[in-house]
Swiss-Prot record:
GO terms for molecular function: endoribonuclease inhibitor activity; enzyme binding. One of its GO terms (cellular component) is cytosol. Homotrimer. Binds to both RNA-binding sites in the C-terminal region of Rne and to RhlB. The keyword Cytoplasm applies. It is found in: Cytoplasm. Belongs to the RraA family. It comes from the Bacteria. This is Regulator of ribonuclease activity A. It comes from Yersinia enterocolitica serotype O:8 / biotype 1B (strain NCTC 13174 / 8081). InterPro entries: RraA, RraA/RraA-like, RraA/RraA-like_sf, RraA_gpbac. Keywords: Cytoplasm. GO terms for biological process: negative regulation of RNA catabolic process.
Length: 161
């Protein structure tokens, strides 16, 4: 489904929170949305492999990487895993790498920046916890909608159709 965050903000301005404009699109799908699962991990993407192995139909992974752009939390291998398990998208408060490959995958990926240095894979981090970045607090179970204009968050799914 295609989302227009500008229209959604006009219609649901009382029900949505708007994430500060810190992010750019890196995936092949420029519009995505779904129920979020949160994870907090700093320069370590080992936990992301476990989470993206799960069925992601209708889900978006929100990764609080502490805003670090020194190491990429998402690479082509993780993005491909997410695509195979039907995740709608990934939002990374941090960096990605292998951007040419990411752009060819039919999955939404938004992040702050790209860097060629990969993350550690020790599995250090926490999932399904409250995370805060971009002026918004994210809880697993909230609903996120993203496009080239921005990212918005709602506690309940928006009636889009």
């Amino acid at each position: 489904m295609k989302y227009d965050t500008s229209d959604l903000c006009d219609i649901y301005h009382e029900e949505v929170n708007v994430v500060e404009p810190l992010f750019s699109n890196f995936g092949g799908r420029t519009s995505f949305g779904g129920k979020i699962t949160t994870v907090k991990c700093f320069e370590d993407n080992g936990l992301l492999f476990d989470l993206l192995e799960e069925n992601g139909l209708g889900r978006v992974l929100v990764v609080d990487g502490g805003g670090s752009v020194r190491r990429a939390l998402i690479n082509a291998e993780l993005a491909d895993l997410a695509l195979k398990n039907e995740w709608e998208g990934i939002v990374v408060y941090g960096a990605v790498r292998q951007v040419d490959e990411l752009a060819e995958l039919d999955i939404g990926i938004q992040a702050m920046a790209a860097i060629p240095v990969g993350a550690a894979d020790e599995g250090i981090g926490e999932s399904d916890i409250r995370v805060n970045f971009g002026g918004v607090t994210f809880f697993s179970g909230d609903h996120l909608y993203a496009d080239n204009t921005g990212i918005i968050l709602s506690e309940e799914p928006l009636d889009i159709e």
